[in-house]
Regions:
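Left-handed beta-helix
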Residues: 1-164
Length: 167
């Protein structure tokens, strides 16, 4: 957050670079969520298929995605190794994610290896790596369903956890 001011104060050499493309500081949970949603927003001029724009990332070798016959995927990105049998809308689905039949993913980011069990619902959330959202569990909520708007924020399920339905 204070890298540039701290470098300036320490007398470090700073160099400016003119940049005209898309850039977003993802230093908060909300801004990380927004940046991912920008990738699927048709009103944001980002062309992921522009071969002159290099994307540097770790890509594990996995089979292609599998979209089940009853699955619904709308305005989302689903990467390799995913098995989608539920409903995915306006979401970013990382490699190796499983969305079981009857599960709903809305306006969310699922990190690599996440599993969403049948009947579970994920809304306005970031689900960490290798996290399991249990059968009929729910995480997150649409902002319009929250009475106290000041308390609403993107929900987070940290990596390597298992969320169960409230009994």
């Amino acid at each position: 957050k204070n890298i540039i001011p701290d470098m300036r104060e320490a007398g470090e050499k700073l160099v400016a670079y003119r940049f005209d493309g898309y850039w977003k500081d993802v230093g908060t949970i909300d801004s990380l969520w927004e940046a991912n949603m920008d990738l699927i927003n048709p009103n944001i001029p980002i062309d992921l298929y522009d071969t002159s724009w290099k994307i540097y990332s770790r890509n594990p070798v996995m089979p292609p995605q599998s979209i089940g016959k009853n699955a619904q995927v709308q305005n989302s990105m689903v990467t390799e190794g995913c098995v989608i049998d539920g409903s995915v809308e306006f979401s970013m689905i990382s490699d190796g994610v499983t969305v079981e039949e009857g599960a709903e993913i809305l306006d969310s980011i699922l990190m690599p290896g996440a599993v969403v069990k049948k009947g579970a619902k994920v809304e306005y959330a970031i689900v960490g790596e290798n996290t399991v959202i249990g059968e009929n569990a729910q995480i997150g909520a649409r902002p319009e369903t929250i009475e106290d708007k000041d308390s609403w924020g993107v929900a987070v399920a940290v990596s390597y956890t298992h969320l169960r339905a409230h009994e």
